[in-house]
Regions:
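Active-site beta3 strand of CheY-like receiver
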Residues: 46-52
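Active-site residues of response regulator receiver
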Residues: 54, 82
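Alpha4 helix (beta4-alpha4-beta5 surface) of REC/receiver domains from two-component response regulators
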Residues: 64, 85-100
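A Lys-centered signature of the CheY-like receiver
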Residues: 8, 104
Length: 120
């Protein structure tokens, strides 16, 4: 399986990838995007099985990327890994088609709880 990790911070992408590996998802291919626009292009080209995205990024935000994917007919599983964890943000994410929102700071357990049903 292929996971697309999208965040404008290279360090945060590495932290997400390390946490995925610690949570037991070390046999998945992981690809990276620096913003929502790049992620949108990569979903078409790379066909990931899951997109993990930050919310706030330049060029195109995570929520804009998700909305664009859904408008284009893509049903790729999509979840947020972001510092925005308010009930309003969770509701907006769910209404746009996100399967989950993992709030920073996160643990490997947060990843297992969110991803076990998606990557099984």
């Amino acid at each position: 399986m292929k996971i697309l990790v999208t965040d404008d911070s290279r360090v945060m992408r590495q932290i997400v990838i390390r946490t995925l590996r610690q949570a037991g998802y070390d046999d998945h291919e992981i690809i990276q995007a620096e913003d929502g626009w790049e992620a949108l292009q990569m979903v078409g080209a790379e066909k990931p099985d899951l997109v993990l995205s930050d919310w706030n990024m330049p060029e195109m935000t995570g929520i804009e990327c998700l909305e664009a994917l859904r408008a284009a007919g893509s049903q790729v599983p999509f979840g947020f890994v972001t510092s925005e964890g308010s009930p309003e943000m969770r509701e907006k994410a769910a209404n746009a088609g996100a399967l989950f929102l993992i709030a920073k700071p996160f643990t490997e357990e947060n990843f297992r709880d969110a991803l076990d049903g998606v990557l099984s």
